[in-house]
């Protein structure tokens, strides 16, 4: 845990001691990057941090922690910070597919000694993910994460481009609207119009690999925004992923086999900050 970086998901008070009524040392603004110096206090949930030369304690539920710093053996491929995979009905989405949507790319991470992406997830949700990772490894798998925190403006941007494709391409519209059994879904199932749980840092998109980190196949590729990605068509791999994640308290999204979220923290703020 020592040396991991994290970001605040709101204005956060720094305290001298790991309790709420301790002396106030200052306030960290939303989206600021800080360094974690210890694990959180299991009783008060306060965690020791360093920020701009100030050392103190903040409430850990208000932090998005960088996953590679704390679970380095997971495979991380944040395609929205490289070349976005978003498609619908195997059709590229103009100005989205193949684009870097987040404005950052891999950077050298001194804590783990290699280049990697920023992968923020709400601190208590990251603890749950550790449990899922442990189960996956025990069963001969690994986790491969494609997305976690997503700024709200990116959600709205991708949705607008997706809607443009949906409204102009009949083949896309057909596969987004109806599954092969004739059940209606529609575009709202595949991308949020305004707010996503990704904007709160409580959701992640992921899949499984084998023990050698070779990605296993699901019924579709990652981020294929149409009815073939719904969980009613899960293959054995997608069902195994679902079993692992739900065993640790994660909730599913019926339209996306890859998406899991922690609804107990749904009151977390909607964030727009971009990582630097």
Question: In which residue ranges do the predicted regions lie?
Answer:
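Short, cationic motifs built from Arg/Lys/His that form the positively charged side of catalytic pockets
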Residues: 12-16, 150
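Envelope-exposed proteins and targeting segments
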Residues: 10, 45, 54, 139, ...
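SH3/SH3-like beta-barrel superfamily modules
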Residues: 27-63
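Cell-envelope/glycan interface and biosynthesis
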Residues: 66-276
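Short alpha-helix capping/helix-loop boundary micro-motifs
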Residues: 18-23
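Short beta-strand segments
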Residues: 24, 54-56, 214-216
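Boundary regions of SH3-family modules and the immediately adjacent low-complexity/disordered segments
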Residues: 1-2, 50-79
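SH3-family beta-barrel domains
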Residues: 1-13, 26-30, 37-40, 69-76, ...
């Amino acid at each position: 845990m020592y040396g991991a970086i994290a970001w605040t998901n709101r204005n956060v008070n720094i305290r001298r001691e790991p309790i709420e009524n301790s002396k106030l040392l200052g306030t960290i603004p939303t989206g600021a990057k800080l360094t974690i110096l210890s694990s959180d206090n299991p009783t008060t949930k306060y965690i020791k941090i360093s920020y701009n030369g100030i050392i103190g304690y903040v409430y850990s539920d208000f932090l998005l922690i960088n996953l590679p710093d704390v679970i380095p053996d997971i495979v991380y491929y944040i395609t929205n910070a490289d070349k976005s995979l978003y498609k619908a009905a195997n059709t590229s989405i103009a100005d989205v597919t193949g684009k870097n949507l987040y404005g950052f790319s891999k950077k050298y991470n001194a804590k783990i000694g290699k280049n990697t992406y920023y992968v923020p997830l709400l601190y208590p949700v990251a603890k749950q993910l550790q449990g899922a990772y442990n189960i996956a490894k025990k069963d001969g798998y690994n986790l491969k994460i494609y997305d976690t925190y997503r700024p709200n403006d990116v959600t709205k941007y991708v949705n607008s481009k997706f809607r443009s494709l949906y409204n102009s391409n009949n083949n896309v519209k057909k596969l987004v609207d109806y599954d092969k059994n004739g059940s209606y879904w529609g575009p709202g199932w595949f991308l949020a119009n305004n707010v996503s749980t990704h904007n709160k840092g409580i959701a992640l998109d992921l899949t499984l690999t084998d023990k050698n980190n070779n990605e296993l196949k699901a019924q579709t590729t990652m981020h294929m925004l149409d009815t073939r990605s719904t969980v009613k068509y899960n293959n054995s791999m997608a069902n195994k992923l679902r079993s692992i994640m739900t065993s640790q308290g994660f909730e599913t999204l019926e339209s996306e086999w890859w998406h899991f979220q922690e609804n107990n923290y749904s009151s977390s703020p909607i964030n727009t900050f971009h990582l630097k």
